[in-house]
């Protein structure tokens, strides 16, 4: 009897076009493909009391996505299972998300989603329950497996590249991963989906919070963090120019939504004082003084591969933002922290991730703890 030597791949089938085409390509490449749909948010269990404007999102989006995933799996000819990681998502992603906002920082839950859910809970389930050799996701990224290391590389479609969100992966996670659409552009992915007749071919990309979806952010956050009203103060003359419902609803550099009437010049958020519940704003003419920095302390650095000081290094502070040249990269002894000097950049905000690149390799990333904006001294 012939032994089936095909490798088994469990694909995260989300009901979107990217994961749909990823599953199709794997099947065409001869893998044994199993689809796995994740439902990780429960509106009732997670005490979400949505306002009227958000009622349409209560569980509906996830169910529609599941129906699309079912249709895709049937069309391709692969089995589809459904799994819930609601507790894992709450403990490892959402609680951190809330704690960062309470600290006045701006977190990125998508990075934690990948680290703890897609490449941990999902990976373990796929390997232990479904006996997978690999897992696959519809990310725009590439992975290069060698005998010693697995390397995370930028996607061909630079506008869609998602390596930023994968910066916290460990070697044990990456070595089990496949990214089937890493060599394709978004347009090519949609073309393949249309040619094969997949129902997701024209489906818009998902937005909002990872696994939660679109929400009115202020209303959503009110479910978990009480409003903390305070004053909006002009930092130049210390005059009160408005009021707010909570410092967590504002980000450094924000211009829109301040509701400041009668000002001679447009204003932006330049500082936040969580203890005094004050948001400081400044005229746009002083933007460079308060927002430009060229040095940052990055904490909890994760190295996907070793840093090579002989190769130029650059950093990305936000997804899709241009890379910034790093002039010095100092690993602080006996810590997982690095001190970096970089070309001047605007509105680099604590809580965000700094993700580092050498050529096409994403070598890792960490959380921005401090910057020297407005001539602040970095302490470490």
Curated annotation (Swiss-Prot):
GO terms for biological process: tRNA wobble position uridine thiolation. Residues 160-162 are annotated as: Interaction with tRNA. It comes from Ureaplasma urealyticum serovar 10 (strain ATCC 33699 / Western). It comes from the Bacteria. Its EC number is 2.8.1.13. One of its GO terms (molecular function) is tRNA-uridine 2-sulfurtransferase activity. It catalyses: S-sulfanyl-L-cysteinyl-[protein] + uridine(34) in tRNA + AH2 + ATP = 2-thiouridine(34) in tRNA + L-cysteinyl-[protein] + A + AMP + diphosphate + H(+). This is tRNA-specific 2-thiouridylase MnmA. InterPro entries: MnmA-like, MnmA-like_C, MnmA-like_central, MnmA-like_central_sf, Rossmann-like_a/b/a_fold. The lineage of its organism: Bacteria, Bacillati, Mycoplasmatota, Mycoplasmoidales, Mycoplasmoidaceae. The keyword Transferase applies. Keywords: ATP-binding, Cytoplasm, Disulfide bond, Nucleotide-binding, RNA-binding, Transferase, tRNA processing, tRNA-binding. The record marks 139, 352 as: Interaction with tRNA. It is found in: Cytoplasm. Pfam families: tRNA_Me_trans, tRNA_Me_trans_C, tRNA_Me_trans_M. Residues 108-110 are annotated as: Interaction with target base in tRNA.
């Amino acid at each position: 009897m012939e032994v089936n030597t095909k490798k088994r791949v469990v694909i995260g089938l989300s009901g979107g076009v990217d994961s749909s085409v990823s599953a199709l390509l794997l099947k065409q490449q001869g893998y044994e493909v199993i689809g796995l749909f994740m439902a990780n948010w429960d509106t009732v269990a997670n005490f979400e009391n949505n306002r009227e404007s958000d009622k349409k999102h209560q569980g509906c989006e996830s169910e529609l996505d599941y129906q699309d995933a079912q249709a895709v799996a049937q069309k391709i000819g692969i089995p589809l299972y459904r799994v819930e990681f609601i507790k894992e998502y709450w403990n490892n992603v959402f609680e951190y998300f809330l704690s960062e906002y309470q600290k006045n920082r701006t977190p990125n839950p998508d990075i934690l989603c990948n680290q703890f859910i897609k490449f941990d809970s999902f990976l373990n389930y796929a390997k232990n329950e479904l006996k997978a050799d690999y897992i696959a996701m519809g990310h725009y990224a590439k992975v290069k497996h060698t005998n010693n290391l697995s390397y995370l590389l930028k996607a061909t479609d630079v506008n869609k590249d998602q390596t930023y969100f994968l910066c916290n992966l460990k070697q044990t996670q990456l070595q089990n991963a496949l990214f089937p659409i890493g060599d394709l552009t978004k347009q090519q992915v949609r073309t393949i989906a249309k040619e094969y007749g997949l129902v997701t071919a024209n489906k818009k990309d998902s937005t909002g919070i990872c696994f939660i979806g679109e929400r009115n952010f202020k209303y959503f956050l009110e479910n978990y963090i009480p409003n903390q009203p305070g004053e909006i103060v002009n930092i130049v003359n210390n005059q009160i120019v408005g009021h707010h419902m909570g410092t967590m609803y504002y980000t450094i550099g924000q211009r829109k939504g301040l509701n400041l009437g009668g000002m001679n010049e447009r204003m932006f958020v330049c500082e936040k004082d969580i203890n005094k519940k004050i948001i400081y704003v400044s005229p746009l003419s002083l933007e460079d003084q308060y927002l430009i920095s060229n040095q940052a302390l990055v904490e909890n650095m994760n190295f996907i591969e070793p840093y090579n000081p002989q190769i130029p290094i650059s950093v990305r502070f936000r997804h899709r933002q241009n890379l910034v040249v790093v002039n010095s990269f100092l690993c602080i002894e006996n810590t997982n922290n690095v001190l970096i000097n970089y070309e001047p950049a605007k509105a680099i905000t604590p809580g965000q991730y700094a993700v580092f690149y050498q050529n096409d390799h994403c070598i890792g990333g960490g959380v921005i703890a401090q910057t020297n904006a407005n001539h602040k001294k970095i302490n470490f």
